[in-house]
Amino acid sequence: MLTSSGPRFLRDGQPHLIVSGAMHYSRVHPEQWADRLRRLRAMGANTVETYVPWNFHAPAPGVFDFTGGADLARFLDTAASEDLDIILRPGPYICAEWEGGGFPGWLLADPAMRLRTRNPAYLAEVDRWFDELIPLVAERQHPNGGRVVLVQVENEYGSFGDDHQYLEHLRDGLLARGITVPLVTSDGPRMNWLLAGAVDGALPTMNFGSRTGEHLDTYAREFPDVPPMCMEFWHGWFDHWGEGHHTRDADEVAGELRTMLSHGMSVNFYMGVGSTNYGLWNGANHDGGLQPTITSYDYDAPIAENGALTRKFHAFREVIAAHIPVPDLPSDLVADPPALAPRELEPVASGVLTCDDLERLSLATVDTVPGLRAVTDAVPEPPTFEQLNLERGLLLLRAEVAHAGGPVPVRLHGLHDRAHVFIDGRLAGIVGRDEGVPETLEITAERGTLRVDLVVESMGRINFGPHLGERKGVLGGVWWGNRFVNDWRAYPLALDMIGGAVAAACALDRDTTGADGLSFRQLALDVASDEAGADANISTSRRGRGFLWVDDAMLGRFWHIGPQQSLYCPGPLLGAGAHTVTIIETDAPLGAADGAVVLVAEAELDGVNSASLAAELS
């Protein structure tokens, strides 16, 4: 069992240095879990750390899913079989650049909900979630024959609030549900963060990426009887759309690691394993404007998004080997994982999904998603995502407006985050928050009754800071000239959960020539028997902005502004035979007529298109 004695950890009574790597099971295909864990162990890690995203397991109130890619028990058991201890961070808040910091969007349907506080409605839902989750974890603790050795209380709470009754409720809830291994907290290295995030009975750990010596001094001065640990060693970083790709020099961060280990500081590499925000699971930040996170979560990790062992892997392994025993590096891990050869994908269908098509798609799939509902009888205000239990995706809002003729300003108040505005089926414009594009359009139309369709997109729920818990949709209503529009119907599209239906809708034989809507195309991807199971890098650098599926699996978003210009497709999705790539494009390529979709040899993660970005924001 892992314990602590003064400034050091003990494992089964012997001094122990934790060398851990973060791997998010929710971001890795489950058939690749064992491979990535094996690579982590080969680097010298003796532990794996993972978050548990609440919303990944709870698609609707009282509905819980621990199957497939959400099979947490399988992941924990696989880690144990690869000879790794486990640090579990169950939240309920996780940050992690994950959709909403792990909070289900349906929590926000309650206007009185206050996240990360002792708000009774919030705590009731946390308790219901922990009743499902924590017993599964408790039976896999080290004293019970498993490999879970540490469990974290909340996450970086010192950067958010000071409701210590809330932290105590979480701590007591973990203990009451059977957690017996040591508890920890995790906060930035400033004392005000560490103190605000602390709770009695939990060991404080720090998150940082540099100035290790200063943080060791803080431990020695402020926490002399606590084993020093960097719970998040930020040797890399995440990317936002429209910004540069973040990397850090391998030798520089290896030097920080050397300082940690030589002074007895345990460490968790954040990230140890690069991965992917499949579907629409990316989060967002807000710093003067919305900053959605890209689809890739490669993070410049020692083990790349595709499993390749990077220079950082070897630099870290060398430092680790000087402090703890490191297993031999298996020869089959040295070469990069196989990838499909570069080729251009052959188009097989293309067209437009009109707003009527989107309505039909919504009504055909609404009953297949837990808790999802449409509004087919008009209501006075445009329903929000949360009111429809729409976690992610698109929302078609439809109304009819009596128009006197001529020009009129149309404003979408509180738009979160982006909308295509159609008048009588024709695209009038695109509006968005914080993109350099206005929330107001000037509409000119003949006198009469007009049909107004808004296709609203959530670009990712904010996962950190004071904007955490923002709702999605048109929150303040639609202003037509000098009056509100008050008769709305709503049709939700949970795109990442209805991939098969999306592909089928795009495959329908119909003439959409001259129609406005969201353009689509389908392409053939044929995999030979000797290529089966290889990964693919699907380059969208010649396309605009939208969503991409392989068969019924949504890989994620693409956007010409970069930095990411290709999407990673894991090999388990690519068996021998014919596959279909489906693209729904919300924005056409700038200055290009019709760009091809191609497979490329390597991931394109560092391709900020500055010209496209300037045009997008002009």
Residue ranges and their predicted role:
Residues 457-491, 588-618:
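Glycine/proline-rich low-complexity spacer/linker segments in large multi-domain proteins
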Residues 18-30, 53-72, 108-128, 152-163, ...:
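The substrate-binding groove and active-site-proximal loops of carbohydrate-active enzymes
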Residues 62-68, 81, 92-117, 167, ...:
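Aromatic- and acidic-residue-enriched segments that line the glycan-binding/catalytic groove
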Residues 1-47:
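N-terminal carbohydrate-binding accessory modules
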Residues 176-177, 207-304, 308-315, 319:
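Catalytic-core region of carbohydrate-active enzymes that cleave or remodel glycosidic bonds
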Residues 33-99, 171-176:
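Aromatic-lined substrate-binding rim segments of carbohydrate-active enzymes
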